Amino acid sequence: MRTDGDSWDIVSSVGLTALGVATFRALETVRPDALIQDDYARWFVEAAGEPHFTGLLADPSLLGDMRFSGFMGSRTRFFDEFFSSATGAGVSQAVILAAGLDARAYRLDWPTGTTVFEVDQPQVLEFKAEVLADHGATAKADRRPVAVDLRDDWPAALEAAGFDPGKPTAWSVEGLLAYLPGAAHDALFERIDELSSPGSHVAVDNFAEGTDMQRFDAIRAKYFAENPFGDIDIAELFYGDERADPVQWLTGHGWSVRRSTSLELAAAYGRPVPDLPEELVDLSERSTYLTAVK
């Protein structure tokens, strides 16, 4: 269970979910119809040495149903394209909130002069930096790690790292919202808005919005023979308290918002999911992707 002020490294609590995401990105990368190319993801999983995830890399069939890694492929592609679109529109600074083991500063082709800020827990960023250094990786942008808890005063830490609120920004909120208490969730959007000059972009995924966590757990147990995250009960890491609806909040604060469901996104990427049970259709319809421009 989560507690106020809890922290983690890459093989515990929320940090372990980042390792899972890296695993699913690595599995997606080797698919013949891969939607992404993330050759860095495998490095992180192998360096961490967590048995469940290294086992999945060695034998993906242990995952059983591959829909979960396919979902991660679509999600990753969505955010890749978001950054490409935003920088193509002239945005020259990007902020990746809860960056985890995200390697976009290394694997995407950023325009010259782009600064990428990665915000996450200190131990997570330290692990990532060590692995990338061990492999001699070179970032394709001006990468600036910002070691801070998103429940704390992260805007101050971001500005201390050189963030300029007077310039348009591309913000990514990927795989994050469910792990925040309601108050921190709402404060996150307030702070993004306050730090965003006109012309800023934001992309958000909102997993299983409005779904009771006990129901989510029951659906997962019913349709997935193996827990994609091994022994960790991901639902226990989520907060299910009241929070603002991101679409309504952003729209009400002057952002122009576009929304799609995970099923719509999968179909757009040539990954339609046929014949899902009604419960999974409902869950997928509640898993949404947003882009917004200020």
UniProtKB/Swiss-Prot annotation:
Belongs to the UPF0677 family. One of its GO terms (biological process) is methylation. Exhibits S-adenosyl-L-methionine-dependent methyltransferase activity. SUPFAM superfamilies: S-adenosyl-L-methionine-dependent methyltransferases. PANTHER family: S-ADENOSYL-L-METHIONINE-DEPENDENT METHYLTRANSFERASE YKTD-RELATED (PTHR43619), S-ADENOSYL-L-METHIONINE-DEPENDENT METHYLTRANSFERASES SUPERFAMILY PROTEIN (PTHR43619:SF2). InterPro entries: Ppm1/Ppm2/Tcmp, SAM-dependent_MTases_sf, SAM_mthyl_Trfase_ML2640-like. S-adenosyl-L-methionine binds at D120, D149, L150. It is an enzyme of class 2 (transferase). Signal peptide: none annotated. Gene3D superfamilies: Vaccinia Virus protein VP39. Keywords: Methyltransferase, S-adenosyl-L-methionine, Transferase. One of its GO terms (molecular function) is methyltransferase activity. Disulfide bonds: none annotated. It holds the Pfam family LCM. It comes from the Bacteria. Its EC number is 2.1.1.-. This is Putative S-adenosyl-L-methionine-dependent methyltransferase RHA1_ro00605.
